[in-house]
Amino acid sequence: PSFVATAAASIRKLGIPKRKVLTVHAIGGQPHVEGNDDLWILLADALKVQTLEVLVVGPDVRDRPARAYRGRVRVTHDAGAYDVANRRVWRAAPDVVIAFHAGFWGYDSWRPTLMGLLRTSIPTIVTSYTMEEARLDVRALGAATLEEGASDDACDAAAAALDLLWGPEENERAGARRVVASAPPGHDYRENNVSFCFRGRPDRGRPG
């Protein structure tokens, strides 16, 4: 599946040093994707990690205590928005955060989450259905560093100053095409079609 392949390739690209436990937080999770624990079992196999600790967070996810698989994969589900300041369900700080098809640009509710992540040095991998949506997601990150209501030009300028580990780029591991009735002519929607990765700066006011 493109979700496993994309996550594995992106985590390898980050060059995270090997460790006993790799901790991944998946934000904006959907029950049929991130909420399907098989995804994380397959990711652990793909990365060949000793232990994979996963926290799946999203308003569409139901609270569920950790479940263990094969003695090396633990997955916890937490309903609600992701807040780096609320660590009640964390077993450890994440090595990486993943946001599949998050659509930062389309939902004001993402703003507090983005503001929090931008105050940490945690790398966050983001995927989108199209290049245009990815660029809008980057703009939303820029907007999260400014006062609400900032102009698009100001948001783009702020986004240009962000620490992008890689900017929006086509993903070789993109998945199936999606038919979207409202899509503009010529727009090709595919699962995980585009990815980028950012990290914030702890000196923004909160430790990473």
Language-model-detected regions and their locations in the chain:
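Positively charged, amphipathic N-terminal segments that serve as targeting/anchoring signals
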Residues: P1-V96, F100-S109, I122, T127, ...
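C-terminal functional extensions of proteins
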Residues: L118-G208
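Non-core capping and flanking segments associated with repeat-based/extracellular domains
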Residues: W110-M115
